[in-house]
């Protein structure tokens, strides 16, 4: 099943646009979990994990592109999976995508309650329980998503602009406060890092998730594999650079031993920002970090819930009337909000669970799709580099992530706390 190449538009979309779509999808509030989840392995090992994850996630994205090019422009991830791997794989893949969206919705309700509670407490002296803050946050976002997709688009655009400004200013402020002795943990010459390495993989994997947007880039650029692959390269490299800067800024400022206090405090966004404020003792930097964290959580929450909203509307065949959207909104927000009320400090655990499901649909499935695509089509337009060894590497990486999360959930892996 193939089609002729899409017609080249008179004015081709810019390479920057596609790159920003990839980087913007990958980078979100989940980055706040990274310093906490990787505090056990600290900076040097975390760089190695980031590089491995970036490489494997870039490869799996290229494999989706390879398979996608054999189908008409506009073919969805689900369509390609069903045709290449069969209905059974497609059902499991769809369930894993829904699981990721639901668990991330819960994560952002939890993270939103934490950072809103901290913001009100530190900025206005108002004490608001995290459960109530999370509930109000969920209601506000639900109202926007229910109202219209255009409302989400406009608000998210404003938030992204604010995020870029506040992140840039926050990082520039933190980089100047990095202490090499803290960054390289020279105060603990006998510290052991490697036992905590395996448990960090799912958190890192979640931070490089963009794979559902590869078919969208086909609509954006047409069948132009060189342009799409460059967008994947640039977008993922931007995400990698942001994460490395964030890791250096946090792990070079907060001593390793103090992360045990953050973990004991619930491992949430507000706790991390509070510790940074204590150490830097800068009200202006605290205001920037607090603003950035609020915007990051809110924009990620809007993006994820819009995706879940559209997915459920299509699955349940709800129409786009106000009542139809209301039914979809109930299905989208009620289950994760109940979870947020029952388990308000589940942000970092939810990110890990998202990594488990993402290991399936964003790593294992793309590798299997590339293998099936090569058997059927021979990949005449584009082939992800690395041949069969690359497919094996990506499959092993996906399985390792899934196993790591299962073992960590059973407490069979060492925990830094």
UniProtKB/Swiss-Prot annotation:
The keyword Lipid biosynthesis does not apply. NCBIfam families: araaP (TIGR00837), PRK10483.1 (NF007789). Pfam families: Trp_Tyr_perm. It is a multi-pass membrane protein. GO terms for molecular function: aromatic amino acid transmembrane transporter activity; symporter activity. InterPro entries: Amino_acid_transport_2, Trp_tyr_transpt. GO terms for cellular component: extracellular region; plasma membrane. Belongs to the amino acid/polyamine transporter 2 family. Mtr/TnaB/TyrP permease subfamily. It is found in: Cell inner membrane; Secreted. It catalyses: L-tryptophan(in) + H(+)(in) = L-tryptophan(out) + H(+)(out). It comes from the Bacteria. Keywords: Amino-acid transport, Cell inner membrane, Cell membrane, Membrane, Phosphoprotein, Secreted, Symport, Transmembrane, Transmembrane helix, Transport. Gene3D superfamilies: Amino acid/polyamine transporter I. This is Tryptophan-specific transport protein. The chain crosses the membrane at residues 16-36, 40-60, 97-117, 126-146, 155-175, 191-211, 232-252, 295-315, 326-346, 347-367, 390-410. The keyword Phosphoprotein applies. The modification Phosphothreonine is found at residue 8. One of its GO terms (biological process) is amino acid transmembrane transport. Involved in the transport of tryptophan into the cell.
